[in-house]
Amino acid sequence: MLGVNYGVSFSNMYFSPSKYNLSPVFSTDYVSITYTKHSKMFGSIPNFALVLGLATGTEGFSFSENPETGYTDNYDDVQQCRIRVIEAPAMMQFHADADPFKFMANAGVYGGWRQSISRSGPQLSKEWTDSFRDYEKRLDYGFQGGLGFALVFAPVELHFNCTVRWSWSSLNEPDYDSKYYYKYAYPLDIMATAGLHFHLTKRRGKTNRELKKEAYEIVYGKKN
């Protein structure tokens, strides 16, 4: 099955040491193409699939003003940041069908590349508003998974998904500022998408009688 998905994202950053008054960055540019291969686990459980894809979207963070002090925090003089990324997720999917609905749970990993960056802050040098520093990592990878449901009208499916993307690649080298006090910045994003998926081969389910027969043969073997 081949699908095209479009959606919005809410991007934030996990900082260590901690930062405060963070606000999510809202973007409307998430697009992905996915290929789904349905298969049986252990040769007998039909509720699984492999999902491979190619996607582009946004990572980032933003600091809001502290209402009590009027101070706005920053990270390396940056108060707002958007990073354009391209990624390739690979996930296992568990799905349960209840015609015409399909309920899905996905979990896996992704690898990607931070293509470009746009950031701002009153103390930020103009040199770094749209370029990466030497100690900032552009290779991206991590966990990706989520929940969703679909409306199935063979040979077309309409998918709605909520996905979490948690990067395991810090935005910067941890010891860039000090060899004794490490700093980390891990992107954490939530995407809400809608997609149109097309069956590449004819979709055929099994009747209850066929499923019972298959289960019987697994337990007791085929009749002579």
Question: Where do the protein language model's features map onto the residues?
Answer:
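Predominantly the C-terminal beta-signal and adjacent terminal strand-loop region
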Residues: 140, 145-224
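Short connector loops at helix/strand junctions that flank enzyme active sites
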Residues: 26-30, 45-49, 83-89, 100-104, ...
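Outer-envelope beta-barrel architecture signal
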Residues: 1-2, 44-50, 99-105, 154-158, ...
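Early exported N-terminus immediately downstream of N-terminal targeting peptides
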Residues: 47-61
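Residues on the lipid-exposed face of transmembrane beta-strands in outer-membrane beta-barrel proteins
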Residues: 4-8, 31-37, 54-56, 88-96, ...
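Outer-membrane beta-barrel channels and translocator barrels
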Residues: 36-45, 97-101, 152-156, 199-203
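Extracellular/periplasm-exposed beta-strand and loop segments of Gram-negative cell-envelope proteins
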Residues: 11-26, 59-85, 112-140, 144, ...
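Short glycine/proline- and aromatic-enriched beta-strand/turn motifs that initiate or cap beta-hairpins
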Residues: 1-40, 197-199, 220-224
